[in-house]
Amino acid sequence: MAKKITGYIKLQVKAAQANPSPPIGPALGQRGLNIMEFCKAFNAQTQGVEPGLPLPVVITVFADKSFTFEVKTPPAAVLLMKAAGLPKGSGRPNTVKVGKVSEAQIEDIAKTKMPDLNTQDIESAKRSVRGTARSMGLTVEG
């Protein structure tokens, strides 16, 4: 028989840098989960990813206080800021443009994000990433 799911926890955790401090500790602690077990497993699974890159993670909590987790791809906004070499996006994206990204960079980011997007078409994924870039005040060249 399958385990009974009691809930889901969604967090953004820096790759290979999970520790029991907030936000991880309180989120897992109030559900009675083993915090160190999650931290060790997450850090081991994200070893190959660039350290410090924020990764969304969905933790499935079961009735017997066990859990599983799924690590998603980094947010498109983070990948775009990294590609443009910016610390953050524009405060007024329609009037103040803060940087530029090339069409090739957009395609690379779209390919990276494909597993988490609800499309199988690379063109749709590129449109989604372009929209994120526009909303951050980035200009797409090419």
Curated annotation (Swiss-Prot):
Q: Which UniProt keywords apply?
A: Methylation, Ribonucleoprotein, Ribosomal protein, RNA-binding, rRNA-binding
* GO CC annotation: cytosolic large ribosomal subunit
Source organism's superkingdom?
Bacteria
**MF-aspect GO terms:** large ribosomal subunit rRNA binding; structural constituent of ribosome
Post-translational modifications reported in the UniProt record: One or more lysine residues are methylated.
The family database entries (Pfam families) matched by this protein are listed as:
Ribosomal_L11, Ribosomal_L11_N
* Known partners and oligomeric status: Part of the ribosomal stalk of the 50S ribosomal subunit. Interacts with L10 and the large rRNA to form the base of the stalk. L10 forms an elongated spine to which L12 dimers bind in a sequential fashion forming a multimeric L10(L12)X complex.
**Which protein, by its recorded name, is this?**
Large ribosomal subunit protein uL11
Give the species this sequence originates from. Acidithiobacillus ferrooxidans (strain ATCC 23270 / DSM 14882 / CIP 104768 / NCIMB 8455) (Ferrobacillus ferrooxidans (strain ATCC 23270))
Q: Which gene encodes it?
A: rplK
